[in-house]
Amino acid sequence: YDENSVYINGIEVHRPQLVSSGQQEGLSVINPDMVRSVAFSTGGFNAEYSDRMSSVLDITYKEPEAFEGAFSASMQGGSLALGTSTKKFSMLHGVRYKRNSSLLGGTDTKGEYDPQYFDYQTHIVLKPSKKFKVSFLGNVALNDYKFIPKNRETSFGTSTNAKTFLVYFDGQEHDKFQTFFGAMSLDFKPNKGNSFSLIGSAYQTNE
């Protein structure tokens, strides 16, 4: 897990350690409605991607050329993305909400599932001249996982000797994951063959 890197617009995105069962993990750090291109490497990548040994996922977000939007909804949540631009300024915002209680209700462990996941991302770009570009990338993720288990029924054995194991639970689980991320980058391109970038980022997580 620690040997896989995720970059958005050249900025490394840090993710908190998640519970190993995976049920508490909510939305992906990548918002598909905001993506322009995706690059993936399983090895032999450039030194700019640090010294991770496994893989690198490099995402580039859009810079809208006009007003645009995307909307989707389902029984488990929805997403909304809006973007606009002028000659020297562009911004793109994305909001996602997910509640997959019906999906988790189909597992072997029966109970009351109430998971709620919220995610907001923004990408703002300012181009004061042809050589300079200032951009900001922000991300807020709020995940709330509630679970009151009742029982779990597990079947094992062979077709001629089938067994069933039934367990009753008492108690509950309540997890909260709050992640805040912001990054500012200054790009300077004096000519076609050279470019320089200065990046500063801050990250905070509460679990």
What is each stretch, according to the model?
Residues 1, 11, 43, 62-64, ...:
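Solvent-exposed coil/turn segments that connect beta secondary-structure elements
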Residues 76-97, 110-148, 172-204:
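Transmembrane beta-barrel wall of Gram-negative outer-membrane proteins
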Residues 23, 109-113, 150-164:
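Flexible, surface-exposed loop regions and adjacent strand-edge segments
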Residues 18, 105, 135, 140-156, ...:
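Outer-membrane beta-barrel and related beta-rich outer-membrane complex signature
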Residues 19-23, 40-41, 62-65, 103-108, ...:
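Extracytoplasmic loops and strand-loop junctions of Gram-negative outer membrane beta-barrel proteins
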Residues 24-28, 40-43, 47-69:
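N-terminal periplasmic accessory domains that precede
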